[in-house]
């Protein structure tokens, strides 16, 4: 009976197997794929008005964040760090919080308990359309990080964040199964949200500095619609969203000159829906006819809303 490889031997075996079929990419190449040129604000160019990546580094039990600008120069600076994590998300501000999250560039799944049979089965299932094919496979040491990079980023509006979290949980339940992980009990599955940061490519894995996190390009970019097709619970599919526009501000100026003049040059706010004052007068009559006790406040709120839509003067 063959002796079971140690974790460090297994790390090397996984790299060798992945290297037979896929191209290994350097850290900066990987993060340029995650965040294409133009995704982030340029250093010193606040006028860009864009979000940025954030790296969290833990040293001596203290965590600090570093901003990633569009040149990605900081990626080289953190290479070899003992513990540095980053998520495929662009943030405004300096903290990786849900409130600061602006754009989702991909879905990253942490698959633990991956030995050689499980590694081979992951790609067997991908090749036979059982689970979605990932864009990059990361050897994180003990397991794999599967990155599904989106063709276009998705805006992280507050109402979408919970939907995307449930969507990702359902995707994890599909990918993490009894053939892809040695952790076969459902309670052993690790469910992480969309903001979860993962050990960065080029930094140390849990096995130490001689065992860096490595990335292999394994597939194409994907869409949310493509991933929806693999969900076991179709009610978790994300459909009410839109992708980031390809138009730059300069291109929008040429294509929509009137919009550019009003919104950008003159700084006008987006137009509201305007209604004739008949609606306001009708609701005011309804209130005078008898707003019931306990509902007066709600009636006045609706009246105020109609007043705005009907352009009723404040003094009235």
Predicted regions and their residues:
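Catalytic "initiation/cleavage/transfer" segments centered on a nucleophilic residue
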Residues: 62, 93, 179-265
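Histidine-centered divalent-metal-coordination microenvironment in nucleic-acid enzymes
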Residues: 109, 132-163, 190-206
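Short, surface-exposed ligand-recognition loops at beta-strand->loop->(often short) alpha-helix junctions
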Residues: 110-118
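Short, well-structured alpha-helical interface segments that form or flank functional binding sites
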Residues: 76-81, 141, 145, 195, ...
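Helical (often loop-to-helix) elements that flank the catalytic cores of nucleotide-handling enzymes
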Residues: 117-128, 150-181, 208-226
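Modules that initiate DNA replication and primer synthesis
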Residues: 152-154, 234-316
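Catalytic micro-motifs at enzyme active sites that drive phosphoryl/nucleotidyl and oxygen chemistry
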Residues: 91-99, 123-141, 184-190
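DNA replication initiation on ssDNA origins
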Residues: 1-106
């Amino acid at each position: 009976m063959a002796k079971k490889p140690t974790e460090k031997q297994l790390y090397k075996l996984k790299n060798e197997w992945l290297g037979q079929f896929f191209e290994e990419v350097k850290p900066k190449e990987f993060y340029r794929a995650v965040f294409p040129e133009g995704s982030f604000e340029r250093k010193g160019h606040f006028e860009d008005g864009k979000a940025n990546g954030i790296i969290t580094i833990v040293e001596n039990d203290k965590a600090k964040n570093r901003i990633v600008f569009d040149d990605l120069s900081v990626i080289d600076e953190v290479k070899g760090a003992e513990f540095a994590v980053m998520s495929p998300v662009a943030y405004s501000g300096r903290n990786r919080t849900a409130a600061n999250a602006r754009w989702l560039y991909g879905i990253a799944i942490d698959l633990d308990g991956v030995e050689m049979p499980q590694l081979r089965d992951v790609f067997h299932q991908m090749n036979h359309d059982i689970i979605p094919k990932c864009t990059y496979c990361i050897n994180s040491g003990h397991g794999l990080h599967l990155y599904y990079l989106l063709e276009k980023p998705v805006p992280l509006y507050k109402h979408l964040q919970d939907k995307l979290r449930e969507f990702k949980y359902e995707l994890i339940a599909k990918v993490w199964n009894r053939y892809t992980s040695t952790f076969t009990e459902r309670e052993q599955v690790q469910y992480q949200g969309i903001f979860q940061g993962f050990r960065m490519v080029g930094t140390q894995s849990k096995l130490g500095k001689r065992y860096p996190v490595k990335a292999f390009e394994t597939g194409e970019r994907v869409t949310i619609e493509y991933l929806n097709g693999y969900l076991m619970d179709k009610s978790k599919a994300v459909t009410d969203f839109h992708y980031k526009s390809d138009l730059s501000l300069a291109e929008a100026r040429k294509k929509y000159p009137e919009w550019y003049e009003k919104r950008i040059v003159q700084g006008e706010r987006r137009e509201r829906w305007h209604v004739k004052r008949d609606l306001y007068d009708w609701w005011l009559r309804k209130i005078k006819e008898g707003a019931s006790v306990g509902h007066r406040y709600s009636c006045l709120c609706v009246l105020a809303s109609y007043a705005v839509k009907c352009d009723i003067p404040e003094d009235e």
